[in-house]
Amino acid sequence: MAPDGVEDSDYESDPDELNRSLATRRREASDDDEDDEEADDHDKLRAAIQIHSDEHSGVVVVDSDDNEGLHIEDSYGDDDDEEEDGDYGQVDDHVEYIADNNDKTIVAGNGTDDSAATDLVDGEEQKKKEPFAVPTAGAFYMHDDRFQELDAASNRRMRGGRRLWQSRDERKWGHDKFEEMNTQKQQYDRRTSRGRGRGRGQGRGQDRGQSRGNNSKEFTGNGHQNQFPKAVTRGRGARRYEVALRNGNQAPSVQTKQSQNSSVEVSHVDLGRPPTETATLETEAIQAKKNVFASSLNSASPPFYPSRSNNNLAQKDVQAGMGRLHINENPNPTGKKFGNTKSSSLWGRTAQTTSHGRGVPPHGQVLYQQSPNQGDKVSSPMQIRGMPKGTDQSCTQLPGQVFNQHSAVISLLPSSPPKTGSSENPYLSGEIESAVETGALVAKGKGSLQPSGRGSFMYGGTQFMGPAGMAAGHGNPNFPAFLPVMQFGGQHGGVPTFGMALPGYFQPEHGTGNPEMTWLPILAGPGALGGSYCPPYTVLDGSYQADKPGLPSSAGSSSQENSSNNPNDEEPMERPEVTNNGNSQRSNSNPNKQPRRYSEMSFSK
């Protein structure tokens, strides 16, 4: 007992206090142990209560094996509490099961049953990560997003094995999508252009809008439909216009040929004439002809007043030609100035051509027919005798032309300016006298210059058209009042040509009459003189032909005799007459109804 005593002697200061301290020391030790265990349990339960607070804080409903709910409460057990609890019966030294009114047991742990409490708490801790552990009630029920991200992400990612938002959010960006759309559109356009574009020119295109182009190709009728690929659409319009021009130029080609022939004729006839003068004559003649046709050529037509420039040209031609006419009898006219000799030869021709008395043709019968190669030449009024019949000079190729008293256009039309220039007489005093000699030379070999039958007659060296026995100075009421014909320059020595006075100005007893009167010398149609005009014409092969083509021209008689009897004589050529289309015309009057015996001539088609 010594050690015990020693210990007692060491520890006890007061025996009473020592006994009391031992008793209390045990209690406090047990209390400390219980407090430690209870503190641990309290911390664990408090965490579980904070997580699983359903109805009120501090109580949690736990499912047990027998499906009874257990209310776990904190027990701050003291000795008094333990004693009071012991009245209900202890199952264990540290854990007491207390039945309440709700058939639920309050479990309080005292440290001995730590494993059971820990298992419960661990089970709750394991359950807190599950979705049902998320609070569905409480202050922040709608704002508790602790598990929403994970839960929503997991559901979003794993539903159906793919993410729900992949189709919308993980697709290409907008610009990538735009490029993809453009790529598809380009592919679509490429396909459609391949199908529709090629089809336009081919089978399908003929059904759609290409019939116009196909019609243009069919319109050609040249067999060139397959010349170009049908898919090529560029030259289609040009080809259509080309076809139109090709078709339209067929008719003008004839006129072009005629104009070319006329230019050739002018070149043959006017070898010595300057081209500018010829052009001037042509233009003036065309204008004069237009003026005459515009007036319908009836008795009410105003007189024709030629311009002074034409007079000058006429005078010049007369002066140059009067002295050369007798030289022109040689058969080869090459090198001669036929442009200058034309007027003089015509002036002298009037006497010879009408001298055979073919007579004035009946009223209403004139045939203006143009030779095929007859052209615009205004300055080729006469052909030299002995010229070949097939030369370009159209005077030998005039088909039978019947002059119509109502169609005496040729006598008035001033296509050759020398004719119009002779309307003023003062300058013709000396040269016209020489023209009389010229007329005699031209008329040689013609036979008698005496009129026979009804028609032309000679008066003062000039052939005068009218009824037989009617002289220039004798007025005959039977003579047509329209466009009368008389001796031109009869007061000046008798010029071998005709003058025609317009209505209201004819004064046969005074010759030319008043100075204002316009006398038109007949340079073209020696027999083409007579009554009023008759406009109707029929065009045959580019020539004018009157209503009654059966009557030959009166002036053709002398030409006929010239060509048949006198091959070396100068054949009379009718005055060229420029029509609206630029082709010259000449008139011959042949009242005897005898067709000319020219080899080139076709009489009245």
UniProtKB/Swiss-Prot annotation:
Pfam families: Btz. GO terms for molecular function: mRNA binding. GO terms for cellular component: cytoplasm; exon-exon junction complex. It is found in: Nucleus; Cytoplasm. Keywords: Cytoplasm, mRNA processing, mRNA splicing, mRNA transport, Nonsense-mediated mRNA decay, Nucleus, Phosphoprotein, RNA-binding, Translation regulation, Transport. GO terms for biological process: mRNA processing; mRNA transport; nuclear-transcribed mRNA catabolic process, nonsense-mediated decay; regulation of translation; RNA splicing. Residues 1-16, 30-40, 75-87 have a biased composition (Acidic residues). Belongs to the CASC3 family. This is Protein MLN51 homolog. It comes from Arabidopsis thaliana (Mouse-ear cress).
